Amino acid sequence: MSFFKWVSFVLILHLLNPTLISCSSNGLSQIPSKFLTLAKRNDFFDWMVGIRRRIHENPELGYEEVETSKLVRAELEKMGVSYKYPVAVTGVVGYVGTGHAPFVALRADMDALAMQEMVEWEHKSKVPGKMHACGHDAHTTMLLGAAKLLKEHEEELQGTVVLVFQPAEEGGGGAKKIVEAGVLENVSAIFGLHVTNQLALGQVSSREGPMLAGSGFFKAKISGKGGHAALPQHTIDPILAASNVIVSLQHLVSREADPLDSQVVTVAKFEGGGAFNVIPDSVTIGGTFRAFSTKSFMQLKKRIEQVITRQASVNMCNATVDFIEEEKPFFPPTVNDKALHQFFKNVSGDMLGIENYVEMQPLMGSEDFSFYQQAIPGHFSFVGMQNKARSPMASPHSPYFEVNEELLPYGASLHASMATRYLLELKASTLNKSNKKDEL
């Protein structure tokens, strides 16, 4: 009898005989370390590194992940894992296990960013102006690694693991399209993770409740009357109006928001004019806004539009505001389920030691994983990859961003462990409730 089969067998026996609790608990606690050992095998590690580098060399933007999804499908086929494609344009959804309920989902995003890689190495991006600068190449690789681990122990799975290879996380709201496609129907829970160089290799971080902010984008066109820069009295200067708008927008957080309710409004784009001596007819500004509650988020949205249009009017200009929701949908706050967070701490603690769990503070960054959490219970976490030999490592969305490939076994085994343990514990809980009803 294999180790994983033994754990399942003992867990079910425990439900019939409570005296076996310590035995079943010990068996469950060994699953994560067993998976980590398997994922660290030289052949397994080298396979993951090869996949990650192939993806990194050929980055694709949101909803354009044609070759990436082709690679994912090819690897799933080699494993004998069934899948659906296309889902949400370029997404792939795989299935490992019994094919029946209960269902638990694991998610990885596949898209890259529109930036030129500046890191000089053998597997640098081959596509000009595109780069995996947020670790999504590693995320996809680790989920494929988890799929391989789970497939090797498919007979022991007490249900079905849904493998979500998602397109377009970077502003495209791919998760929303995955939900709309019905992928999460009958799924009990979903888990996602993200690489970070703010934690040491072998550490993980998360928190219960609000974790990442809700986010939205805006752009505004401010129109005046152009003319010669030497004769400003004959113009209506949109650059000056836009400058006043930007300053006024900063007051929304500093003077209108509760200091204990974290919010951000940032103007990150300003375009206007083409000559040193000509005042343009119009300028365009754009930016992002963030908040941890839906109420605060919608209030910011309302006030951003009011401030832009009214401040422009003060300067005798007209303004139109576009929140570009079709192109970049609003992301809700990422809020971790309480029970799933405790489950994550238990599993990661069994794998890495509870001392390697780091309680994180809320971040103003955003994640479209939140769309899943609006539909079903979900949990999001960070996996460390800090490389002390190459410290400091560049932050995500930097052209100098790098992934420490030593983290790949940790992410793959953590994914596989959470799915396996979740299904085992869910079955145990269901049987336990059934036994209690029979006793009544």
From Swiss-Prot:
EC number of the protein: 3.5.1.-, 3.5.1.127
Expression triggers: By jasmonic acid (JA) and by wounding.
Q: Specify the signal sequence span.
A: 1-23
Q: Across the pH scale, how does activity change?
A: Optimum pH is 8.0.
Localization, per the record, is: Endoplasmic reticulum lumen
| Resulting phenotype, residue 230 to T | In iar3-3; reduces activity
Name the principal localization, coarsely classed. endoplasmic reticulum
Record flagged with keyword Ribonucleoprotein: no
The record describes how the cofactor is bound as: The Mn(2+) ion enhances activity.
Q: Where are the transmembrane segments?
A: none
Show where the record puts the motif Prevents secretion from ER: 437-440
Binding residues annotated for Mn(2+) 2, in chain numbering: 134, 136, 194
Q: What class of enzyme is it?
A: hydrolase
Q: Which cofactor does it need?
A: Mn(2+)
Which superkingdom?
Eukaryota
What InterPro entries would the database entry show? Amidohydrolase, Bact_exopeptidase_dim_dom, ILR1-like_Hyd, Peptidase_M20, Peptidase_M20_dimer
Biological function: Hydrolyzes certain amino acid conjugates of the plant growth regulator indole-3-acetic acid (IAA), including IAA-Ala, IAA-Asn, IAA-Cys, IAA-Glu, IAA-Met, IAA-Ser and IAA-Gly. Has a lower efficiency with IAA-Phe, IAA-Leu and IAA-Val and no activity with IAA-Ile. Important for IAA-Leu hydrolysis in roots. Also hydrolyzes amino acid conjugates of jasmonic acid and 12-hydroxy jasmonic acid.
The family database entries (NCBIfam families) matched by this protein are listed as: amidohydrolases
Provide the protein name.
IAA-amino acid hydrolase ILR1-like 4
Protein's organism: Arabidopsis thaliana
